[in-house]
Amino acid sequence: MKTCYYELLGVETHASDLELKKAYRKKALQYHPDKNPDNVEEATQKFAVIRAAYEVLSDPQERAWYDSHKEQILNDTPPSTDDYYDYEVDATVTGVTTDELLLFFNSALYTKIDNSAAGIYQIAGKIFAKLAKDEILSGKRLGKFSEYQDDVFEQDINSIGYLKACDNFINKTDKLLYPLFGYSPTDYEYLKHFYKTWSAFNTLKSFSWKDEYMYSKNYDRRTKREVNRRNEKARQQARNEYNKTVKRFVVFIKKLDKRMKEGAKIAEEQRKLKEQQRKNELNNRRKFGNDNNDEEKFHLQSWQTVKEENWDELEKVYDNFGEFENSKNDKEGEVLIYECFICNKTFKSEKQLKNHINTKLHKKNMEEIRKEMEEENITLGLDNLSDLEKFDSADESVKEKEDIDLQALQAELAEIERKLAESSSEDESEDDNLNIEMDIEVEDVSSDENVHVNTKNKKKRKKKKKAKVDTETEESESFDDTKDKRSNELDDLLASLGDKGLQTDDDEDWSTKAKKKKGKQPKKNSKSTKSTPSLSTLPSSMSPTSAIEVCTTCGESFDSRNKLFNHVKIAGHAAVKNVVKRKKVKTKRI
């Protein structure tokens, strides 16, 4: 009668690992052979069963598998075949079934550790031989494994006995698909090969007897597919269960096999012995190495030496090889790589690089780098001017004016003088008849300052009571410390141009103030308005709203414009302002 492992240890099925350990120690002290000298044989068998039960239950995986198959293991009788739906299957087809194999998961069957018929070696060995025979027969049905004789070994066990059959086939490893379990004198290395092979067991059985439905040709296509699907599912489940059961049985027998424990112990002792011998040899060499220093000298082997006469030949070969490599490299030529450091790209040809330079991506990256460099220069104080350099400064305008074509300059001056002469002749008798205003426009790098003079009729001026000027200026932001410098440079340029003696048809030179801000004239009794800041070209002592007229050449002041014009006419102090472009820029008022 089989005994449950939990009952054998005296614990509940939900006992913890600590409770199992305490129960095993208690049972071991009770049934250990040393504690029972009067009944050693019975105590040994009982103690072996207790130890096997504890080894199974102490392993979580083994315990889970035992709990799921406990009823089948404890059942001594094979499964009943009296069911209505069950049918008898030939044993040669099924071989050892899963249910039959579960009957041997009983440690009480392996209490005798000897070579007898009731011992563990013959019981377990015959089971493994039967399993190997089933696999060979299944393989031969599939047209495989014709060279293996595992089925012959099982037949020899029945005819000549297990021990003699093992002796006949133990050395025929090439004729056996699965190694033999052997018996007590079997080598430890052979046993390791046995357990390694059987631990990777995978059956070749078809398990067709596990089909749930009988296949018939009369079924329609849909029914056939469904029947095949369900039958294949049942076969696969049975196949997986069989493989797991065989692997569990291998682990179960390995725990009971003393040969593995003794062999591992002997192998460890041999390893330690060899390690100790190696250490002793090293110590002896170190100890006696100094005494035999003169006698035991290191000598090069014949294959480690090179004859002197061969050195010259080797050097010649090396020199020739170097010349050959150099000539080869010269033939190959240099490989040029074209690289754009801005975009971090490489090109194989110069044409590709040029095409890349014309792309929008390269230009965009180039502009970003230029802006970053400008910002860094301003931050570090490396530039004398700020971002206002993008606009026309006084220095730039002077340099640009020096490069202007003389003919274009003369034509512009003649046009300005003609307009000034006409406006002065019409309104010379009255001060309010002339409304000449000048405006300065600060444009982009390519533009210069622009002068525009508009006149309005007297009737229109009386009606509106205010002169309206249609010129707009662009306000320039500049540093205070550069205003005087730019004004002086512009005055010098105007003076130099005036000295050339350019005159109109009436021999009169008229000069207009180059940089005077125009604005609306305020009415009487009206609120004061904010005046526009004066530009850098005006004298620093003169405000934009002052009524005093000043000669830009000699600096003399006059109360009215007529006096200023008479002075310019007599003294010839006409200052000329060149106009290259006429571009109106709207000014946004903030």
UniProtKB/Swiss-Prot annotation:
**Record-linked Gene3D superfamilies:** Classic Zinc Finger, DnaJ domain
Q: Which residues carry this modification: Phosphothreonine?
A: 504
* Alphabetical list of PROSITE patterns matching this protein: DNAJ_1, DNAJ_2, ZINC_FINGER_C2H2_1, ZINC_FINGER_C2H2_2
What one GO molecular function would you report for this record?
Answer: ATPase activator activity
| Location of the region described as Disordered in the Swiss-Prot/TrEMBL record | 269-293, 441-546
SMART domains referenced in this protein's UniProt entry, alphabetically: DnaJ, ZnF_C2H2
Which Pfam family, an example, fits this chain? Answer: DnaJ
Q: What is its main location?
A: nucleus
ZnF segments: C2H2-type: 338-362, 549-573
What are the subcellular locations of this protein?
Nucleus
Q: What is this protein called?
A: J protein JJJ1
> What is the species listed in this Swiss-Prot or TrEMBL entry?
Saccharomyces cerevisiae (strain ATCC 204508 / S288c) (Baker's yeast)
